[in-house]
């Protein structure tokens, strides 16, 4: 019996997000608002990996991630890699990192925080622990764990 393989076509131009934590691909599509963008998107889930047991991969045609989207991606899957594709070749490889200060991408869960009540006040968080992903609002000092992070 011959083995049937599912093959995903290479993209001419766009972004490939590789080494995503397994099971995080859908959440990344949602947070980055990619699923309704009108462009072709491929999501591969639980793909075998040499570096990590399993991984997700996202391919987005004709689009490159903004700096703000890359910051959100770092919070969702810090070990992910972003590859910019131009004319079917990798033109640029980006290793993402969680910034020490996270500005304007995460909502503070404290309803009384100044960042939720003052116009023009951007949210700012300090990275407390990169392994368990714990952040702290610099205004109200509220600590937020990974599972409670809400993106703006």
Segments predicted by a language model, with ranges:
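Cys/His-clustered metal-coordination modules, chiefly Zn-binding fingers
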Residues: 88-152
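Interaction interfaces in information-processing and related assembly proteins
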Residues: 2-94
């Amino acid at each position: 019996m011959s083995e049937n393989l599912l093959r995903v076509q290479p993209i001419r131009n766009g972004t490939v997000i590789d080494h995503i934590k397994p099971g995080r691909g859908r959440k990344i599509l949602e947070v980055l608002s990619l699923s309704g963008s009108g462009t072709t998107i491929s999501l591969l889930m639980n793909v075998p990996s040499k570096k990590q047991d399993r991984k997700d991969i996202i391919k987005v045609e004709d689009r490159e991630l903004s700096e703000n989207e890359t910051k959100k991606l770092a919070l969702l899957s810090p070990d992910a890699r972003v590859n910019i594709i131009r004319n079917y070749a990798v033109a640029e490889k980006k290793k993402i990192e969680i910034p020490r200060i996270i500005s304007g991408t995460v909502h503070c869960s404290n309803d009384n925080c100044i960042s939720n009540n003052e116009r023009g006040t951007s949210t700012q968080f300090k990275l407390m622990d990169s392994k368990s992903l714990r952040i702290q609002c610099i205004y109200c000092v509220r600590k937020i764990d990974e599972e409670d992070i809400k993106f703006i």
